[in-house]
A protein has these predicted regions:
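Pyridoxal 5′-phosphate
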Residues: 1-409
């Protein structure tokens, strides 16, 4: 069926099956016919997280790490609690790691690589992979151009593993733990981290797609840095950098500003980040998004308290959608297994027009190349695609509705 006929007839024979009562508590604000399938871009925020952000603005709106009045003290206490919670969430030791906040994953990775000095670290090769988001692909490209160090793009295995034998000694490895295209997971993550360190290398992980539903993969994973976004983990818009203290010796500060210094003379300054208890300020020039940081703490608590039934529901939704997409004769699905992230295209159907048609039915999906241009457009030479990414707000009836619509093609 063409899109024109589809848009004319779909309302006549598809009932809205979604039921508010089936939704995970916290998303009651969604209307019955609003189906959000774009969690890989940014997750919806459950009401307790929204309330936490509002509480900051209404109860103790203040500048952190700068003031002596009571509101500021409350902010400082809650921000530090978020830093501690993040390390406990991933079972990492405070003596080894620190937490800094920034804009998003892309900014965090770029901030690290723009400050990184390969000569200090003895790095001779930059390694990334073919299925990386542009945040990794472009920043490693820029680092290579700046330092004239060879950059190698490795192909990931079908299960997401990176071939260890192709990683040279003294390499800087920057890769994702989960793909934002097909949900492929870096299956040999722990072996890779251990191998890179044995070969006198450094490894930085893009965990943007990992933290919300697969954070267990990162627990006690002793990478040199882990970057992710709060807005993909049911928290407000925020970037998070979890950095090994030992990595700092290979960094040259590039951004400077308030909150990073103890004193400033005419031509010199005394950096705060040289103190271990203030080392996080290395990546935090100026005022931070204090309310968003505090609300991130609430999102971690919300995730920790999710009942198993909610997790099972998401797993069931993923498996049901994968079974359909992988078996439909006209749908080309890139996934090799069920995931919370699915990418596909349909024969003779423009994906951008399909996304608009689905939007007419209250179904929100992404279309295009999802910031993975090299892999999708140039390596696989695919047309623009549709991405459906699931979250804890989704229900089985929403999957049924999507399937019923796609069956029309």
């Amino acid at each position: 069926m063409g899109l024109f006929n589809f848009r004319k007839t779909v309302d006549q024979d598809i009932e809205v099956q979604s039921s508010i009562k089936d939704r995970t508590p916290g998303f009651e604000y969604l209307k019955e016919n609003e189906i959000y399938f774009d969690s890989a871009c940014q997750s919806l925020r459950p009401q307790p997280v929204i309330n936490s952000l509002i509480n900051y603005y209404q109860k103790h709106n203040s500048c952190g790490e700068r003031v002596k009045y009571q509101w500021g003290k409350i902010t400082d206490q809650k921000v530090e609690a978020t830093r501690d919670h993040l390390l406990k969430f991933l079972k990492l030791k405070k003596k080894d790691y620190f937490v800094s906040f920034t804009l998003n994953t892309t900014y965090g990775i770029n901030l690290l690589l723009s400050q990184f000095d390969p000569k200090k670290a003895g790095i001779k090769t930059i390694i990334t992979s073919d299925i990386e988001h542009n945040s990794v692909f472009l920043s490693t490209m820029q680092l290579s151009n700046r330092t004239k160090i060879e950059r190698i793009v490795l192909s990931r295995d079908q299960d997401g593993s990176l071939p260890l034998s192709e990683v040279p000694d003294n390499s800087l490895v920057v890769v994702n733990v989960m793909s934002n295209v097909d949900g492929r997971i870096l299956q040999n993550l722990r072996d890779l981290v251990e191998y890179v360190h044995q070969k006198q290398g450094i490894i930085i992980l893009d965990a943007a797609q990992t933290m919300a539903h697969h954070s267990y993969l990162l627990e006690q994973t002793e990478a040199d840095a882990i970057c992710f976004s709060g807005h993909k983990v049911y928290a407000p818009s925020l970037g998070v950098m979890i950095v090994h203290r030992g990595l700092v010796e290979y960094l040259n500060p590039t951004f400077l500003g308030g909150g990073m210094v103890d004193d400033v003379d005419k031509n010199t300054y005394l950096p705060s980040f040289e103190h271990q208890d203030k080392i996080h300020t290395l990546f935090e020039p100026g005022l931070q998004s204090w309310g968003e940081i505090i609300a991130l703490d609430e999102s971690l608590t919300w995730l920790e308290q999710l009942p198993q039934s909610t997790k099972d529901n998401l797993k069931g939704c993923s498996e049901k959608l994968f079974e359909f997409l992988s078996s439909h004769p006209k749908i080309h699905c890139l996934n090799h297994h069920a995931s919370t992230v699915f990418t596909f295209y349909i024969d003779h159907i423009d994906s951008h027009l399909l996304a608009e048609a689905l939007s007419d039915q209250g179904i929100m999906v992404r279309s295009g190349y999802f910031c993975v241009h090299y892999y999708l457009d140039h390596k696989l030479k695919l047309p623009p695609l549709i991405r459906v990414s699931l979250g804890y707000q989704n229900t089985e009836s929403e999957i049924d509705r999507l399937i019923k619509i796609l069956k029309k093609f």
